[in-house]
């Protein structure tokens, strides 16, 4: 759409939402973020294939180590979901939430400044994060 400068998707059901054409028609930078422990929308199955269809050189796929589908949800430790354990809620949801905010900011700042969006293995808020561009993601198979 006109006036749209970037898109950020988090734990996206890529195969369900985007269909066969995926994100191919989006001509702005996209930051797609998934968690390495996400059992609901596993990054390789749900984010990689749609990401590989993107054409913009500043699009990025970020995988947050220890992040789950629920890591992004702000919850108190005494809530029932948090008692399910790290297999479902991730290693440390608060750190992952900080990392998500920082990933958003880094991505948008790079676009605002007219530079290239960050890529590579990064420590974001103390969390290891793998940020891939199209070239890095190309040889990967879901």
Region annotations inferred by a language model:
Residues 67-68, 75-142:
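Alpha/beta-hydrolase-fold serine-hydrolase catalytic core, especially in secreted/extracellular enzymes
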Residues 1-20:
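Primarily recognizes the serine-hydrolase "nucleophile elbow" in alpha/beta-hydrolase
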Residues 2, 19, 50-51, 119-121:
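Generic structural signal for short, flexible, solvent-exposed coil/loop and linker residues
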Residues 7, 61, 108:
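Divalent metal-coordination and catalytic microenvironments
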Residues 25-97:
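Active-site-adjacent alpha-helix of alpha/beta-hydrolase-fold enzymes
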Residues 1, 36, 43, 122-124, ...:
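Proteins with a high burden of low-complexity, intrinsically disordered sequence enriched in S/T/G/P/A and R
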